[in-house]
Regions:
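N-terminal small/polar loop signature for handling phosphorylated ligands or for N-terminal nucleophile
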Residues: 9, 23-101, 105-109
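Small-residue (G/A/S/T)-rich helix-start motifs and N-terminal tracts that mark the onset
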Residues: 1-42, 47, 141, 147-184
């Protein structure tokens, strides 16, 4: 769905999937979309050079960053947003979603009424089995890289992923354009 004059909250994890979220935030801001990032740690503490560099780049262009917000602060951001980007966990996730991310899922479930856009796989869903051992994001659209993951077409993943978009990452702006269109 397209949102006129929309705003986006990007929920970023500490690893590579979070790095994808920082890149998405930077891309959206460059397109004139109002965007804010929620992160569990300061950008300098993000794991992986590429993810940390993406976070630093997003911060350098003035994207608002909310580090480890409490529940009320997160809810305040969510009720004003039109789109949430779930870039918390990716294909390597297994098990139960740890704190504070379980609280992020709860806040989105309870207070967010817009579109949820997951990066690679809805966080909380096992990309191999499609199962969840705890809370998970219910996406309207999931942008997955290169190919469908088995967990996106099996178990809870089949329902949690929403509409699936496969991006090649090489000269393929389909996913980026769809995300930007969702926020306009």
């Amino acid at each position: 769905r397209e949102v006129e004059e929309g705003s986006v909250v990007v929920l970023c994890g500490k690893g590579n999937n979070g790095g994808d979220g920082w890149v998405a935030a930077d891309y959206l801001a460059a397109q004139g979309v109002e965007v804010a990032v929620v992160a569990p740690v300061e950008p300098s503490l993000i794991r992986g050079d590429a993810a940390r560099d993406a976070a630093k780049r997003a911060c350098s262009v003035g994207i608002p960053v909310h580090v480890a917000p409490d529940y009320e602060e997160l809810v305040a951001l969510l009720v004003e947003a039109d789109v949430v980007v779930d870039a918390v966990f990716g294909t390597g996730f297994h098990g139960v979603m740890p704190e504070p991310f379980d609280m992020w899922v709860e806040a989105v479930d309870d207070y967010f009424e817009g579109m949820v856009f997951s990066v690679d796989v809805p966080s909380g869903i096992d990309a191999t089995t499609g199962q969840a051992e705890g809370p998970y994001f219910q996406a309207d659209t999931t942008l997955t890289m290169f190919a469908l993951k088995p967990g996106l077409i099996a178990g809870l993943g089949k329902q949690a992923a929403g509409q699936l978009v496969v991006a090649s990452l090489v000269g393929d702006d389909e996913g980026s354009e769809e995300l930007a269109d969702s926020a306009r």
